[in-house]
């Protein structure tokens, strides 16, 4: 009987705790608050490592949301030309740079839905680097074409408040919002 109680107690502890560890959570501080992001290391290990390495180095702090399309997505992560704290900052070139370390695609079965974080890339499927986007809504036409590496678990209203770009300019943003700070919990 005590073995059954022990099993029940352990089961309760496992299921009542968070389903992710703190190491799997990235905090994204924006002007309107903090966004918590759960990473999918099991689905996109190389991409999660690249992102977390850049976060740990502070590479994303000050990086602008250079392309934001209402109802679709907010794109950021150009650590080369999009970092407003850097001497290389150039809003006209934001979206064309990265860290210089392209990653092989890790397309997976995670859907592009509201709150999904996925890697931006060029035409080459293996050209993802540091840029990523957050989906404002469901975007199934991206499934299997971009690497999903995380999802917003708290603070989606903060993401919704990111300054939107001009639709005529494909979402390019004048005087864009930026990442104030990113850190791993």
Model-derived features: where do they sit?
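N-terminal secretory signal peptides that target proteins for export/translocation
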Residues: 1-2
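Bacterial N-terminal signal peptides
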Residues: 5-15
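Cyclophilin-like peptidyl-prolyl cis-trans isomerases
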Residues: 18-185
């Amino acid at each position: 009987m005590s073995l059954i109680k022990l099993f029940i107690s352990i089961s309760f502890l496992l299921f009542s705790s968070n389903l992710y560890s703190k190491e799997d959570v990235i905090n994204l501080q924006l002007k309107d608050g903090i966004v918590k992001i759960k990473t999918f290391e099991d689905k996109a290990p190389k991409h999660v490592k690249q992102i977390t390495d850049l976060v740990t180095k502070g590479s994303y702090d000050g990086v602008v949301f250079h392309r934001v399309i209402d109802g679709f997505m907010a794109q950021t992560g150009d650590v080369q030309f999009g970092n407003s704290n850097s001497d290389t900052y150039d809003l006209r070139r934001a979206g064309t740079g990265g860290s210089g370390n392209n990653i092989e695609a890790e397309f997976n079965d995670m859907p592009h839905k509201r709150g999904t974080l996925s890697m931006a890339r060029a035409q080459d499927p293996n050209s993802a680097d540091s840029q990523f986007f957050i989906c404002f809504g469901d975007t199934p036409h991206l499934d299997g074409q971009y690497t999903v590496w995380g999802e917003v678990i708290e603070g989606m209203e903060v993401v919704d408040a990111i300054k939107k770009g001009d639709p005529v300019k494909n979402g390019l943003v004048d005087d864009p919002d930026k990442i104030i700070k990113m850190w791993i919990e």
